[in-house]
């Protein structure tokens, strides 16, 4: 769709804020790379995004993991996951000093915030049933990390 004044007038403030966030977080590069794909690849990506979920729940060897991009905004243990907004999972960073779950076998696995900014180290960070796995691969002194939930073995590239 062409971006005209009329089109922009149809946006409410919330939509404009979301568009602004996207523009500030790589929209131009995303569009340029998307346009290079075949129509079939573009269709597959759009279908994937339409089925996107903001979180994934996984149980491994009696441990429960909530996998999210960033964290859980406005967290309450009594609040069900479907009561959260997608922004709570994608943008809101957790408070590492507050345990979110009383159950020692419940964990929140997050990315988004490089561990370099949490404790100054490019390694997987564990605290209060949080597991932060973004080790700042995009930074000169960062690394790409992977955590095997079956064994809790850490891998770094």
Where in the sequence are the language-model features?
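Core catalytic region of metal-dependent phosphoesterases/phosphodiesterases
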Residues: 1-18
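Acidic, His/Gly-enriched loop-helix segments that form or flank divalent-metal centers
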Residues: 14, 21-132, 136-142, 155
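Short, charged, surface-exposed secondary-structure boundary motifs
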Residues: 4, 141-145
């Amino acid at each position: 769709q062409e971006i005209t004044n009329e089109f922009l007038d149809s946006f409410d403030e919330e939509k404009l804020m979301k568009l602004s966030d996207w523009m500030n977080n790589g929209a131009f590069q995303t569009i340029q790379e998307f346009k290079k794909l075949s129509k079939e690849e573009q269709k597959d990506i759009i279908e994937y995004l339409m089925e996107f979920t903001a979180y994934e729940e996984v149980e491994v060897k009696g441990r429960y993991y909530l996998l999210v991009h960033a964290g859980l905004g406005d967290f309450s243990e009594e609040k069900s996951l479907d009561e959260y907004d997608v922004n709570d999972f994608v943008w809101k960073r957790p408070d590492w000093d507050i345990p979110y779950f009383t159950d020692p076998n419940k964990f929140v696995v997050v990315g988004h915030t490089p561990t370099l900014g949490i404790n100054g180290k490019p390694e997987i960070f564990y605290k209060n049933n949080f597991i932060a796995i973004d080790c700042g691969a995009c930074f000169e002194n960062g690394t790409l990390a992977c955590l095997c939930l079956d064994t809790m073995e850490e891998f770094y590239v």
